[in-house]
Amino acid sequence: MPVEGATTSSYNEKTFWYYPWGKSVTHKDVDIFAKEGTNVCSSTTGLAVFCGYKEMGGNVVLVIGPKWRLHYYAHLKDIKISCFKWVSRGEIIGTVGKTGNATNTSPHLHYSIMTLIPYLWRIDKDKQGWKKAFYLNPISYLETK
């Protein structure tokens, strides 16, 4: 679990691929709610390829891990690592916040996993269903770790 102390009751599994969802149309991630400032840990070993600010994600860390999977951590209050740093699974990379388009919500980590190699068989007729080739269900990943 990328948020210290979080459990399955800290998120709603029905929010992955939820439609409609504002500017992003479909929610392709899971929001893990916690007290602002709670540590966020890398859920994988890998290379931090982006650490900075994005308009919608706010303070963001992007880690590329095994199988060319990108782990996206957004709405962070603080970023605790530098870009192009190797991180270990469980290493603190930031803290839970509400930056970017989450300023009017409860503090949470917006977490997603994307693959660089498309899984074409996952495409369907849902809104933005073609993106299912790239976005993996992070809840399935969390439950196996």
Positions of predicted regions on the chain:
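Solvent-exposed coil/turn segments that connect beta secondary-structure elements
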Residues: 37, 45, 66-68, 99, ...
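Generic beta-structure capping elements
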Residues: 10-11, 66, 76, 114-116, ...
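Small beta-barrel nucleic-acid-binding modules, principally OB-folds
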Residues: 22-32, 63-67, 113-125
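Active-site loop architecture of trypsin-fold serine endopeptidases
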Residues: 96-110
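Acidic, glycine-rich catalytic/binding loops that coordinate metals and/or anionic ligands
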Residues: 82-91, 112-145
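Zn2+-dependent peptidoglycan hydrolase active-site motif and core
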Residues: 42-80, 106-110
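A generic structural motif
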Residues: 35-37, 68, 76, 91
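Surface-exposed, glycine-biased beta-strand/turn segments
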Residues: 1-59, 89, 98, 135-145
